[in-house]
């Protein structure tokens, strides 16, 4: 529940929150806008693309929306002061002279590489892919398929039911799916040959022809310039082990070692025997440090040294001569990687590859430079106890070694000679108190001797033999508790825990206060390539290119250099919600604070700076487990579930023609850094090598590549429990819990009238003790009291000065593991540290393994037409053609001597075929052949150019409401709210302490100070506070706030539109509700029909029916469109809204409803008798289709610009039958200003037997 103060704040914000940008002016009807005064109904344009109107003292402004009609000019211009582009006046261009193409020249020498272009502006983010199916929960209990429905109930993604008619007239449902294709008709008869048509546009490029024979070898080109230096090679393999060096010289004494790790806690010692009281001896001089022991056995071989730094890059090799061009090879491999693209969504984690084979054991390399500090590995297993070595001779002081990491604890060795005093170790936890020994007799107190003069330092004595092991001494008296240590260094972040089981859905928590705006994080690394975007709109068709002769395919060109980034494209439609990003790294653990007792609330002080990180304190004892808390309030609905996998890949594009051979490109930019390779298995341990001589410091090499991470070590023993880390980042929200059962609605009680003033009540109970008075003057000193009992033990004193370091004690035996403590209370979250500076760039990693193939890319845009190719080689001789027609008649020979008429001879043999005649004209088109069997699948050609854009399709039906978008950035903290009302008086406090110190204080007290004069106080208040009135007012205000925050669609509490009503009350059914889009006075609210399935707001026309009759009679029927409301007798334009309200009220509410909506739709049903509404069945065209008039007085037609085309859901008026039929029109648009329809204009009317009527459907906004 929301507190009263919060609700009052929301009430005040809601009252003063304007819902629409309006400038409310004085009540005289005039308006003032931007310092200019306007009269009522004045219209002006403050900007070229904005128009405003003064409406009864209110300024309504709207943007001018240009028609989406395509202009038939390449570069439209916007005139000065106008908003929409127009085609400029162009002058005819001079015609170009024809030209002939010369032979192809030799390739020129490569130019010098150009300067790197300036980076282009960042492109608009691509549209995310469609959401995929929900993921599968591996650890969830098995559930039936129906249990996912609660997760999607909040999105209202439901199957569309059969549309119910809107009373009182029915509305046709959505069109059914298209029927199956009919069988092909029989071939028609051959028609007469048509006349020659005009020259058609160039056809689509044909399939590429077969590869021609390779051309002759070209001339060898001149040698190119030497290439740039290559990138450094990968690090070489470790070299062979060198010869052992000579023993080094004696090094300087090393620095004192770091304090050793804290030893295991020893066992409790036995009670010692009672000692004899000895005389206190004089303090002996400090002995000289003993000689170092002999070096022990050589230890096992150390781990393989770190990888050495890579050597300097080699010089560039000589540039070889260009070889002769070979034959055209197959499609080459992908070119070098381009520059890194914009970051895309993270891909899914791939499966771990199989472990590689164990490599051969390499020789240990030379020791590399010390690397950066790595993360601490897991503790190794406990090694075997070492053997006790025999005491060796004193060795020379060795060189200072590099401090090693703490090794595993060895077995308990023999006690060594007492060493020199080391630095004080870390303070250990206090041991358990030992048993008290028997009290010894006190020795005689010696006299204090005089300080002697310090003697000269004697020479070091010879090393004594090792003495026998002494008995362990008795435990000392437990020391006083030490001061609290400073906080420890920040611990390393713990590894990610296993995912917990899915918890039950929590109840709704109360909203927390807004946190301060966090500092800007470090710049993240570039993401991987994004998922394929939505398919782009087809481009404008290019001008037809000239037909070039197909040339032979050229040799494969080398990849060219990356071009400069193109300009940013236009902003695309907003995409659906993308995949969620990967889980961020765990935050660094915060400081553990002690849980203090809750103090009284203080006034908020200014935020202090973050303090330095302190040293770690000793771990406290585990507290008892807390009681289980009460369940919290119901939680808010969870965030949207994870999107599914990527959608199916699109169809492959058509193959395109091969382009001409490109020039040789310069060297490409280096590709993005690859991922680290899979680490190999750990090789076997090599034999220990002898200690080499210490070499001089070598020159600093270039920074080497970061080596792959080593294999994980064997699991160590159980480590000490680490400090509690900072709370990690908030995990992903769990799935929303199941929807609770609907509660029974309680009856709303009417507000009671204020009761009559009651009689004055009886005297109330004694009030709580008043505030403490001012302190009195200091009294006289009293007599000394009797000595009190012994006090409890005092707290630890201040820390004394540091004592001399004691000798190192024997390491105690390891103690047993303690029982795990109970879970401590959760400490308060630490203060947020300041953002650290961005870390230095890490070394470049080695090349990663090739990634998996990316998803199928989208079809590319149509490339620019290529230049005409070179002339092809002559084709092979074709097969002989069919015999030609008879040749032309030969010329007449000279006249012969006339012979006698002979008898007709017998028919001769067929003569030899004549020569091939000229090619005849093309015959008429033959009948369509039968469908052939599908051919074999051809080889995949290169992608073809994109076809010209098709006509705009009809508007689709509105899709379901998409899922809620991602949570926006956190807003800035709002201003402080007004002070809340004073709270109710609290209950009476507990009785104060009585009488001081008990029975002993009943005696005579001390004399008090002399009193002051009279004190004047206020008269008692006559009128008591009436809590009933206050509670009644609070309840009334609370109800008003609830109504503002959650309107119910009633006349007294209207909503802005049906979509808001659906979000606030998803349980409501479709029906009539009250809305007030302009959020003004409730008296101008309008009643609408709410479709709760989609959230649409529907207004009915008034009247909604045009009667069926003969509305228009003329002799020239069917010649032009006639508007029903403008031209026909008795006709009217369609109006919408409540007829009882003034016309301007409905217009204003409709204007605001358009602003609050993103799309609109409306159906018009035309009833016909011998009148064609859309398709003329006789002619097969739509020349007699009627027109609709939009609210902005533009025609909505059957053909033309698709933005102004209606759809036809049912067409029953295609011919004159003498019977009534109907045609249903539908218009959907995202330009809400175009609806509703205000008039209709049929064309096939005017005859005495032609009648029509209209049903105007409701206009629906979403």
Swiss-Prot record:
It comes from Gallus gallus (Chicken). GO terms for cellular component: collagen trimer; collagen-containing extracellular matrix; extracellular region; extracellular space. The keyword Glycoprotein applies. Residues 995-1003 are annotated as: Nonhelical region (C-terminal). This is Collagen alpha-1(III) chain. Collagen type III occurs in most soft connective tissues along with type I collagen. Keywords: Calcium, Collagen, Disulfide bond, Extracellular matrix, Glycoprotein, Hydroxylation, Metal-binding, Repeat, Secreted, Signal. It is found in: Secreted, Extracellular space, Extracellular matrix. The C-terminal propeptide, also known as COLFI domain, have crucial roles in tissue growth and repair by controlling both the intracellular assembly of procollagen molecules and the extracellular assembly of collagen fibrils. It binds a calcium ion which is essential for its function. Ca(2+) binds at residues 1076, 1078-1079, 1081, 1084. Its main location: secreted. PROSITE patterns: NC1_FIB, VWFC_1, VWFC_2. Disulfide bonds join 1058-1090, 1098-1260, 1168-1213. Residues 228-240, 265-274 have a biased composition (Basic and acidic residues). Residues 102-118, 192-201, 253-264, 276-295, 339-376, 534-549, 631-640, 672-684, 723-738, 781-790, 802-817, 828-838, 927-940 have a biased composition (Low complexity). Residues 24-150, 1018-1262 form a propeptide.
């Amino acid at each position: 529940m929301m507190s009263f103060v919060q609700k009052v704040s929301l009430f005040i914000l809601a009252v003063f929150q304007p819902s629409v940008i309006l400038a409310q002016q004085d009540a005289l009807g005039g308006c003032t806008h931007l310092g200019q005064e306007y009269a009522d109904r004045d219209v002006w344009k403050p900007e070229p693309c904005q128009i405003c109107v003064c409406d009864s003292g209110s300024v309504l402004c709207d943007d001018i929306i240009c028609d989406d009609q395509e202009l038939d000019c390449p570069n439209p211009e916007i005139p000065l002061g106008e908003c929409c582009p127009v085609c400029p006046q162009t002058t005819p261009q001079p015609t170009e002279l024809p030209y002939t193409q010369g032979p192809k020249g030799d390739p020129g020498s490569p130019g010098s590489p150009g300067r790197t272009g300036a980076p282009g502006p960042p492109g608009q983010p691509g549209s995310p892919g469609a959401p995929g199916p929900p993921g599968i929960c591996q650890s969830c209990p098995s559930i039936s398929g129906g249990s996912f429905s609660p997760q999607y109930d909040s999105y209202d993604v439901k199957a569309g039911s059969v549309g119910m008619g809107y009373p009182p007239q029915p509305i046709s449902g959505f069109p059914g799916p298209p029927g199956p294709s009919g069988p092909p008709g029989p071939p028609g008869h051959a028609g007469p040959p048509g006349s020659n048509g005009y020259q058609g546009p160039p056809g689509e490029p044909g399939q590429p022809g077969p590869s021609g024979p390779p051309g002759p070898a070209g001339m060898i080109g001149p040698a190119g310039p030497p290439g740039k230096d290559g990138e450094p090679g990968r690090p070489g393999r470790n070299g062979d082990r060198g010869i052992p060096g000579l023993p080094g010289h004696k090094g300087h004494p090393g620095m004192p070692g770091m304090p050793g790790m804290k030893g295991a806690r020893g066992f409790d010692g036995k009670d010692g025997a009672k000692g004899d009281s000895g005389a206190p001896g004089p303090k002996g001089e400090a002995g000289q440090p003993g000689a170092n022991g002999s070096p022990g056995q050589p230890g096992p071989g150390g781990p393989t040294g770190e990888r050495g730094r890579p050597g300097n890059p080699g010089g560039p090799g000589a540039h070889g001569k260009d070889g002769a061009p070979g034959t055209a090879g197959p499609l080459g491999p992908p070119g070098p990687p381009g520059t890194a693209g914009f970051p895309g969504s993270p891909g899914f984690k791939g499966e771990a590859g199989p472990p590689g084979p164990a490599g051969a054991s390499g020789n240990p390399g030379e020791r590399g430079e010390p690397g950066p500090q790595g993360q601490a590995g897991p503790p190794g297993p406990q090694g075997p106890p070492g053997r006790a070595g025999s005491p060796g001779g004193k060795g020379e002081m060795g060189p200072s070694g590099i401090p090693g990491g703490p090794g595993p604890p060895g077995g308990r060795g023999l006690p060594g000679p007492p060493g020199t005093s080391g630095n004080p170790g870390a303070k250990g936890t206090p041991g358990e108190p030992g048993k008290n020994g028997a009290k010894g007799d006190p020795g005689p107190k010696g006299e204090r001797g005089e300080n002697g003069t310090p003697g000269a330092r004697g020479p070091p004595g010879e090393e004594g033999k090792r003495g026998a092991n002494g008995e362990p001494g008795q435990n000392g008296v437990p020391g006083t508790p030490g001061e609290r240590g400073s906080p420890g260094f920040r611990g390393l972040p713990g590894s990610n825990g296993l995912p917990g089981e899915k918890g039950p859905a929590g109840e709704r928590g109360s909203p927390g206060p807004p946190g301060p705006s966090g500092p800007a994080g470090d710049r993240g690394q570039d993401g991987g390539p994004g998922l394929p975007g939505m398919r782009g709109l087809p481009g404008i068709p290019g001008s037809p290119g000239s037909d070039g002769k197909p040339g032979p395919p050229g040799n494969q060109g080398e990849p060219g250099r990356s071009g400069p980034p193109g300009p940013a494209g236009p902003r695309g439609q907003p995409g659906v919600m993308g995949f969620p990003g990967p889980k961020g790294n765990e935050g660094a653990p915060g400081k553990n604070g002690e849980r203090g007792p809750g103090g009284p609330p203080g006034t908020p002080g200014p935020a202090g700076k973050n303090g330095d990180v302190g040293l770690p304190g000793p771990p406290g004892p585990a507290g008892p487990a807390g009681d289980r808390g009460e369940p919290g309030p119901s939680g808010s609905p969870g965030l949207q579930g994870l999107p599914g996998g990527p959608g199916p890949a699109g169809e492959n594009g058509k193959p395109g023609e091969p382009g001409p051979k490109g020039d040789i490109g310069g060297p490409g930019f280096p590709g993005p850094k690859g991922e680290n390779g899979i680490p190999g298995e750990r090789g076997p341990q090599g034999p220990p090598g002898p200690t080499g001589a210490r070499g001089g410091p070598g020159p600093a090499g270039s920074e080497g590549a970061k080596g792959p991470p080593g294999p994980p070590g064997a699991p160590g023993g159980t480590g000490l429990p680490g400090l509690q880390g900072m709370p990690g980042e908030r995990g992903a929200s769990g799935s929303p819990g199941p929807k609770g059962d609907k509660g029974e609605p309680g009856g709303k009680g009417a507000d009671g009238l204020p009761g009559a003033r009651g009689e004055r009540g009886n005297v109330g109970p004694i009030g709580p003790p008043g505030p403490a008075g001012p302190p009195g003057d200091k009294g006289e000193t009293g007599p000394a009291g009797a000595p009190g009992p012994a006090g409890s033990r005092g707290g630890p004193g201040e820390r004394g000065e540091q004592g001399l370091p004691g000798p190192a004690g024997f390491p105690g035996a390891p103690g047993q593991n303690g029982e795990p403590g109970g879970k401590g209370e959760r400490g308060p979250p630490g203060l947020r540290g300041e953002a650290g500076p961005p870390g230095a760039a890490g070394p470049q990693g080695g090349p990663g393994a090739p990634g998996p193939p990316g998803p199928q890319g989208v079809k590319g845009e149509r490339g620019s037409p290529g230049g005409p190719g070179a002339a092809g080689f002559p084709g092979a001789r074709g097969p002989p053609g069919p015999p030609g027609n008879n040749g032309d008649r030969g010329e007449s020979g000279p006249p012969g001597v006339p012979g006698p008429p002979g008898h007709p001879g017998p028919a001769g043999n067929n003569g030899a075929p004549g020569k091939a005649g000229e090619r005849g004209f093309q015959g008429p088109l033959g009948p369509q052949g039968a469908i052939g069997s599908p051919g074999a699948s051809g080889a995949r050609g290169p992608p073809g150019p994109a076809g010209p854009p098709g006509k705009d399709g009809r508007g689709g039906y509105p899709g379901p409401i998409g899922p809620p978008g991602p949570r926006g950035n956190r807003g800035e903290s709002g201003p402080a709210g007004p002070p809340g009302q004073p709270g109710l008086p609290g209950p009476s406090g507990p009785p104060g302490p009585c009488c001081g110190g008990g029975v002993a204080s009943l005696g005579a007290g001390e004399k008090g100070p002399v009193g002051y004069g009279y004190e004047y106080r206020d008269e008692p208040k006559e009128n008591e506070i009436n809590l009933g009135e206050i509670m009644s007012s609070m309840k009334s205000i609370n109800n008003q706030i609830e109504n503002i925050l959650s309107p119910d669609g009633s006349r007294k509490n209207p909503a802005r539109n049906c979509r808001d009503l659906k979000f606030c009350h998803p349980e409501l059914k479709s029906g009539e509700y009250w809305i007030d889009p302009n959020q003004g006075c409730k008296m101008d609210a309008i009643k609408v029909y709410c479709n709760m399935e989609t959230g649409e707001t529907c207004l009915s026309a008034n009247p909604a029916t045009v009667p069926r009759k003969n509305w228009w009679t003329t002799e020239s029927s069917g010649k032009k469109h006639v508007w029903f409301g403008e031209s026909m007798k008795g006709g009217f334009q369609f109006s919408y809204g409540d007829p009882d309200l003034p016309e301007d009220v409905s217009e204003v509410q409709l204007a605001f409803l358009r602003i609050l909506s993103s799309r609109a739709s409306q159906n018009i049903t035309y009833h016909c008798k011998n009148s064609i509404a859309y398709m003329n069945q006789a002619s097969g065209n739509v020349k007699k289709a009627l027109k609709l008039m939009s609210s902005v007085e533009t025609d909505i037609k059957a053909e033309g610009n698709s933005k102004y085309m209606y759809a036809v859901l049912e067409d029953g008026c295609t011919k004159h039958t003498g019977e009534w039929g109907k045609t249903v029109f539908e218009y959907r648009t995202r330009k809400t200003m175009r609806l509703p329809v205000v008039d209709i204009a049929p064309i096939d009317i005017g005859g005495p037997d032609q009648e029509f009527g209209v049903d105007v459907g409701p206009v629906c906004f979403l």
